[in-house]
């Protein structure tokens, strides 16, 4: 189900456009979400770059370099005011849907102006896939230790990543 889009300037640094899709139950409780996000630094910030090569894992997806991060998330935590997460949650709230309290998420990023795959660029296509964690029988606290993912998360990560990669298809024109 397509819930809508938003276009905004993020932190006076970049132009963002996001589109949100969900799979939900009859009570509008989200089971899965698909967040497609385009972001470009503003011309007034010519030196700024997105940095993925230092933190995220590199992979070849859809014929190009992509940067991957998986993590558990607590939807009950308030997003930073003005953040892209706040815009994402506002789309969901306005459409009358509810996020589960605990999610498993995958962020897949392609830097559109980084043909060499360095992890540094000014324009990105970001795709975020999320699933309700409840069907696993685990909680955020069970898959993290001192704020870092643990062996329980590692067991969930590979199948989650495969579902996320298969959820999106990217074709260049």
Regions found by a protein language model. Name each.
Residues 136-173:
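Long, compositionally biased interface segments
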């Amino acid at each position: 189900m397509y819930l809508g889009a938003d276009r905004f300037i993020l932190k006076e640094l970049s132009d963002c456009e996001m589109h949100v899709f969900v799979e939900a139950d009859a009570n509008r409780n989200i089971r899965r979400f698909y967040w497609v996000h385009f972001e470009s630094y503003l011309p007034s910030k010519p030196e700024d770059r997105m940095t993925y090569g230092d933190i995220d894992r590199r992979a070849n997806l859809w014929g190009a370099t992509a940067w991957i991060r998986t993590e558990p998330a607590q939807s009950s935590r308030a997003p930073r005011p003005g953040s892209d997460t706040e815009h994402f949650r506002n789309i969901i709230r306005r459409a009358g849907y509810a996020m589960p309290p605990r999610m498993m998420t995958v962020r897949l990023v392609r830097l559109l102006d980084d043909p060499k795959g360095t992890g540094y660029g000014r324009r990105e296509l970001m795709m975020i896939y999320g699933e309700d964690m409840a069907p696993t029988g685990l909680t955020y606290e069970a898959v993290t230790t001192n704020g870092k993912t643990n062996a329980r998360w590692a067991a969930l990560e590979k199948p989650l990543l495969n579902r996320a990669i298969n959820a999106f298809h990217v074709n260049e024109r």
